Every structure is written in C-alpha cells, then in structure tokens.
C-alpha cells in the first residue's frame, strides 16, 4: 500500500494553482469583497463598476429578495420590509438597544434572546439578513474570478463579543461560505498599510464605521504585526451622527412620533445631508411627509459639528485608554491610520489631528482598506505563495477568568493577551467530600465576580470525595483565532472532564463596553481592598470549618476552660466576618490559630497512638 503524502504546513495541496479566496468587509452601511490577483489586493466591482454594496436587504411580495442599491432605493417607500444596519443588531437583544428602537423603522418581535424583525416574508433575524449580503458578495467574487471560493476572511469590529462573532460566522455558514478566519477590522487595516507601505513603528488605527468604533495600537516591524492594545465601542458610529441630526430635525419641526415610512425618509435625507457637509458648508433638507406636512430646513457645517462634537470626543476616550494600555505616548505614534467612511467627516479628522499633533494617514481609501487587508490575509490562509512572509499577532480586549470561592474573579487570560492562546490553572475543592464543582466563566477587569460580566457556567461532576484542598482540577481556557472561547475542567486523578464553548445569547450593552475598563481603573484601590477582605473571609471560614470538625471528633481532649477559649475564638472570628476589615479578620484568625495550637498537638498525639496500636517494633 502506498504511503499517503502530507504537505508541509501552510503549503497548498496544489502548489502551482492559485486558490481562490476573498476578504469581506461586512459593514454597517456598506459591504465590500476583495481578493489578491497578480500579487496585488483589489476590491471587486459589480456589473455597474461599483465596489461598495449597500448593506440593505428588501423582502419582496413575490418571495424574492433584493440586496444593495435596489433595496436601498426602496427604503423610503417600503421601510418595514427593507432592513439596513443589521450589523448593529447581530448577536444582540432588544434590551441591548435600550431606548433607541424608536428611530429604527422596524416591527420587532417579543423574543428576548434574539432580535426578530417582522417582514412580509415572515420573521427574519439579523443573521439571516447578513447572510443575504454575504451571498451577494460571494456571487460577485465567484463570477468575477471564474471559480468557487475555497474560503473567506470576514472582518469584525475588535470589540465584537463572543455572541456577535458567533452570529457573524452563522451568517457566513447560511451564505455557504467557508470562514478561514474572523479578523478584527483595525488589524485588517494594519495589514493593508503595512504591506503596501513597508512601514515600521507604532501606529494607531482609528476606525469609525457606520455602527461601531474601534481603536488599535499596533507595532509594525519587518515580518511582524503585533496588536499592543485595543479599545472601542460596538455601539458608536456614523449612525449615531445621523440620529443626532434626525432628532434635531424632529425638534425643529415640532415632531415626536413618525410612522415607519416617514422615519425612513427623514433618516435617508439627514444621512445625505451629513455627507454633503463634508464638501459643502451648508446642506438643505426638504421633504413632504405622508400626512402632507412639508419640511424645508437648512443646517450649516458649524451647526452639525456643534451638534455631534460630543460623539467625536467620545471616540477619543478609548484612544487614550488604548495608548495607556500599550505604554505608548502620543509623541511615539508614527502614524494614525483612518478607517471607515465616517472618518471623512471633517471635524473627526480635525479632532484626531489635534489629539495626535499630526495629519492622519489617508492614502488608502478608508472605505476599502479593511477589505483589502482581509483579502491579503485570506490569500495567505488559502495557502497561496506570497512575496514575503509575515506574522499577525492579535489580542483579546478584556480579561477572561472564573469565579473562586468567596465571589473572587481569578483571571486566567489577561487582557491584551496574544491570540490564539490556551492557558491552564489548577484549582481545588473547598469542602471535605466535595464531589462537584461549578465553573463560572467571567469577563472583565474587576476583582469581584459581581462587578464582571458572566459568560457561562458548567458543572464538573464525579470528583472523588477527598479532604478539602486535596483534589486537583485543571481548568483550561482556549481562545481560537476568531476570538471564540472554550473552557474545560479535568480532575487529575480520575480524568473526569467537562467543557463548554462560550456562545452567550446576548451582547454587551453600550454602557458595559465603554465603562468596563474605566471602572477597573477608577475602582482599583476599592477593588483590591474588597478582594483582600474576600480572601480573608474565605481563609477564616475554612479555618472555622476545620476547627468545628476537629471539635466534633476530639473535644474530649480539652478541659472546660480550653473548650471555652476555642469556642470564644470562633465566635470572635465569626463576629469579624460581618463587617470587619481584612486586617481585623486575619488578626482574629491568627488568634484562633494560636488558641488551637495545643489542641492540634493533642490530636496529633492521639492519631499517632492509634496508628501504633497493635504494631510491633519490627513492623514500625
């Protein structure tokens, strides 16, 4: 029998044939697909020469589906069946949207776990809507390239959580795409700029898209792309600038509630006005509503800037934090890469230039740069030969860990750890005879579980009954290249194991995303004090349990005075547990330990005597 051949890792099975792969920027407002041909990355146009595909899907009465510009043109007249900005909804719940549903012209379902949109073709989810966009891009790529795609790299905001990332992969699967990797959008931009310009040094990627904001601090050196720190807000983007203009328009015209058609009409007009103000000093908004009311309003560039300046400043908060996390000063940044169509707004460019004291880089189209980087990555992962070797190191934005006794958060994978990664740590039981252990996986920077985000729980059963602290349970955290987490727990003596893939049914809400890191910094001293107290409580409870168990077995070794002293020591310690500080609890525990020293010695002697009873000198 002939031996099977195995190719070298990374090599194509057919080394002389270019394998077709593509990079997809699945955007809030527009989506693009790009590929590498003749060693150069380029976005693929549609039949009319347009590279951008509006991220809009319309469900028709005849059962058909429109995607892109045709659907966009019907948004004003058929808003309930025309879905845009699905990226803002994917992997989220109604609760995550807070009060902002009133300006979204959709009929939402009552499902609390998954957002549902009622259309004439029935209930549709953001995953299904996104899948239609991906199908269109897949068809465009395969028709242009003349063959089937072996795989794609799809970009996502760096601050997308597990639910949003998994939902994106589900959409790709529905579209019939093989996902080679999910790639953070700022990282994709760095790939495009790094390879095109052969730059080295520290760069900041400022990515303001239609629905999300991301910032990454990257170190680019020859052959190495390393993400030093990330930050951002998954619910801040160009749509929010539109929303501010929309609300101002309602205020100026004394409007409160609009029907879906009028809402969609005005939203499209304020979006057009926003884009006009990039090149003009004034924009005019004219419309006739369904009730016959006429609207004719002008807004100046200065008014628009004043109205939305707080949103621009809001983007600089994660920028400041990311620089701090990376240990980099503004003066050390070699360049600022602008990504996303929303960075075309002049006051955004001005704010970034003022903050860094330099003109941002914009020699690549900000709408295309993410797709270009994804295409380069897809080309490498497909096994196609490249002119030069390079390595991409991505990071996880928040720490991951688990709950230990006393409500403490034990970090297993610290934030800004390079991914993919796997880390393990041994834990033990707290109670004698404990045969099960609940593994509570959390995310965040705070010291107490109550202040972190709960991701998942699972139970390891079948632990052999042993004395407290004797069992050894190894817990392993593993994050794949897409940023998805799996956790396993294994009891070392028996090999009994349990595991879980963390796929939460909801996303982080807006406040949580932006506040988690700031809270960890501002509450650092209080958190450490709370952790110290919690640790002292755990140690004290363990001590009192051990002493009480010993008294049940061997209290006859003590006279009345000794027994009273120990019971008083236990009472004093338990009294400190209610409201005492960490140092007070530890002092009371030390006192109880001292009181029980003689008791421990007597117990040791008794156990030795029992062990020696009936033994000959020779046996000993």
UniProtKB/Swiss-Prot annotation:
Pfam families reported for this sequence: HSP70
Keywords from the named record: ATP-binding, Chaperone, Nucleotide-binding
Coiled coil region boundaries: none
SUPFAM superfamilies associated with the record: Actin-like ATPase domain (SSF53067), Heat shock protein 70kD (HSP70), C-terminal subdomain (SSF100934), Heat shock protein 70kD (HSP70), peptide-binding domain (SSF100920)
GO biological process, one term: chaperone cofactor-dependent protein refolding
GO (cellular component) term, any one: cytosol
Domain of life: Bacteria
UniProt keyword Nucleotide-binding present: yes
MF GO annotations: ATP binding; ATP hydrolysis activity; ATP-dependent protein folding chaperone; heat shock protein binding; protein folding chaperone; unfolded protein binding
Purpose: Chaperone involved in the maturation of iron-sulfur cluster-containing proteins. Has a low intrinsic ATPase activity which is markedly stimulated by HscB.
Family per record: Belongs to the heat shock protein 70 family.
Stated name of the protein: Chaperone protein HscA homolog
Organism field: Neisseria meningitidis serogroup B (strain ATCC BAA-335 / MC58)
Species lineage: Bacteria, Pseudomonadati, Pseudomonadota, Betaproteobacteria, Neisseriales
């Amino acid at each position: 029998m002939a031996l099977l051949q195995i190719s070298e890792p990374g090599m194509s099975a057919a080394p002389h044939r270019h394998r077709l792969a593509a990079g997809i920027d699945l955007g809030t407002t527009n989506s693009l697909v790009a590929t590498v041909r003749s060693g150069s990355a380029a976005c693929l146009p549609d039949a009319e020469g347009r590279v951008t595909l509006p991220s809009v899907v319309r469900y028709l009465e005849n059962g058909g589906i429109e995607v892109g510009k045709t659907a966009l043109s019907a948004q004003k007249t058929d808003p309930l069946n025309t879905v845009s900005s699905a990226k803002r909804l994917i992997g989220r719940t109604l609760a995550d949207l807070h009060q902002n549903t009133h300006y979204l012209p959709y009929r939402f379902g009552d499902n609390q776990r998954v957002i549902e949109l009622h259309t004439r073709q029935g209930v549709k989810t953001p995953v299904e809507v996104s899948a239609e966009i991906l199908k269109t891009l897949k068809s465009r790529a395969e028709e242009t390239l003349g063959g089937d795609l072996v795989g794609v790299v799809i970009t996502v905001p760096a601050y997308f959580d597990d639910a949003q990332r998994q939902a994106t992969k589900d959409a790709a699967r529905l579209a019939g795409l093989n996902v080679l990797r999910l790639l953070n959008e700022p990282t994709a931009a760095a790939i495009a700029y790094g390879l095109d310009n052969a730059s080295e040094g520290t760069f900041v990627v400022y990515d303001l898209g239609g629905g999300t904001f991301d910032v990454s601090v990257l170190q680019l050196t020859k052959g190495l792309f390393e993400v030093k720190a990330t930050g951002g807000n998954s619910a801040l983007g160009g749509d929010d600038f539109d929303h501010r203009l929309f609300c101002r328009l309602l205020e100026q015209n004394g409007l409160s509630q609009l029907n879906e058609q009028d809402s969609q009409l005005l939203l499209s007009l304020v979006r057009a006005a926003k884009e006009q103000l990039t090149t003009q000093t004034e924009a005019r908004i004219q419309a006739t509503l369904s009730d016959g009311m006429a609207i004719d309003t002008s807004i100046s560039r200065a008014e628009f800037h004043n109205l939305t300046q707080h949103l621009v400043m809001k983007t600089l908060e994660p920028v400041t934090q990311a620089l701090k996390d990376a240990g980099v000063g503004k003066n050390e940044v070699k360049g600022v890469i602008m990504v996303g169509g929303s960075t075309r707004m002049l006051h955004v460019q001005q704010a970034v230039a003022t903050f860094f004291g330099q003109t941002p880089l914009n020699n690549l189209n900000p709408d295309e740069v993410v797709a270009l980087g994804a295409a380069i990555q897809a080309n490498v992962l497909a096994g196609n030969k490249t002119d030069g070797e390079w390595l991409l190191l991505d990071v996880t934005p928040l720490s991951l860990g688990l709950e230990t006794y006393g409500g403490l958060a034990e970090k297993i994978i610290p934030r800004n750890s390079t991914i993919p990664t796997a880390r393990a740590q041994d834990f033990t039981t707290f109670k004698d005879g404990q045969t099960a252990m609940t593994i509570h996986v959390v995310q965040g920077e705070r010291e107490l579980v109550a202040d972190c985000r709960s991701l998942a729980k699972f139970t390891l059963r079948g632990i052999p009954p042993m004395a407290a602290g004797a069992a050894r349970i190894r817990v392993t955290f593993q994050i794949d290249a897409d940023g998805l987490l799996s956790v396993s727990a294994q009891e070392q003596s028996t090999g009994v194991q349990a595991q879980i893939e963390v796929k939460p049914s909801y996303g982080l809400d807006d406040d949580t995303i932006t506040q988690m890191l700031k809270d960890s910094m501002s509450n650092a001293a209080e958190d450490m004090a709370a952790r110290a107290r919690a640790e002292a409580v755990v140690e004290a409870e363990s001590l009192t349990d051990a002493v009480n168990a010993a008294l049940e077995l061997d209290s006859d070794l003590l006279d009345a005075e000794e027994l009273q002293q120990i019971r008083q020591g236990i009472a004093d310690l338990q009294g400190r547990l209610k409201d005492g500080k960490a140092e007070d609890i530890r002092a009371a525990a030390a006192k109880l330990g001292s009181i029980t020293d003689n008791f421990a010695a007597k117990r040791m002697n008794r156990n030795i005597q029992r062990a020696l009873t009936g033994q000959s000198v020779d046996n000993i």
